[in-house]
Amino acid sequence: MIDLFLNNPQRSYRIDERIISKTGDDYEVLDQIGCGGNGVVYECIDRAGSVYAVKFLLSLSQKSKTRFSQEVLLMQKANHPHLIRYIADGTVEAVENNKNIVEIDFVIMEKADRNLLDYMKSNEKPEYEEYAPQFRGLCEALAVLHQFAIHRDIKPENILIKGETWVLSDFGLCSFLSPEDHQDITKLNEKVGPMFWMSPEAIDCYYFGGKEIGKYSDVFQICLVFVFVLTHKYPGGIFSAENIDTTPLIKELILEAISNDYHK
């Protein structure tokens, strides 16, 4: 048996060490490798010996469950080498606080080596030959994602590194574009987006009840991440060409994207 905790040892969920997906495949749950606002991430291994990451949703509220199901659906729909790869999903029976029997949702995905923030903390600024193909790949991946949804939560922690590939992950705050999939449960004036990385329209929406957050917001956020990679500093203030050390074309595209114009 394994005890799952969510930043609180007094709130635990005990599950069997083997979980079974909706397709009938079973996985052994190993060590914890991450923790978020509503869930925990563990390493897991299948019968063939392949190692993956499994995310357990430890919030039982309907709002959290709806967001989680939308996240899983988006992982299934959006396929690209620079988007986190879906493997399987399902539910597992758990004992909550040694008392109640509850159902815990989980999703299994490819396992990364680390996230971009951890990488930047332990490394100098990457060379052009390393970051340029990753920037291009992430932009292409975002274009694929935008066929279905808006991410709204792009930050270095949500960009994972697997081998030499940077992968966009964590679709928990995504807003679907199609009416049949769309169920935006974000309240008016609810903060959407991470500190340091919020777009002008996200700030306007949060503080002043402004317009909806659209695709341009994602472009703004991912280009702020690119600035972080290129400068090794958290973004803030007014940027100029002198602040960013890269090729003229990349510099021009980034500065255009992080302007305060909603339509750029």
Model-derived features: where do they sit?
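Juxta-kinase regulatory segment immediately upstream of eukaryotic protein kinase catalytic domains
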Residues: 1-22, 30
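Conserved short submotifs of the Hanks-type protein kinase catalytic core
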Residues: 98-115
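AlphaC helix of the eukaryotic protein kinase fold
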Residues: 62-77
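Conserved HxN/HPN-centered segment at the entrance to the catalytic loop
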Residues: 79-95
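Conserved activation segment of eukaryotic-like protein kinases, specifically the C-terminal portion
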Residues: 186-205
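Protein kinase catalytic-loop region centered on the HRD/HxD motif
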Residues: 138-149
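Protein kinase glycine-rich loop
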Residues: 30-36, 41
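Activation segment signature within eukaryotic-like protein kinase domains
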Residues: 134-135
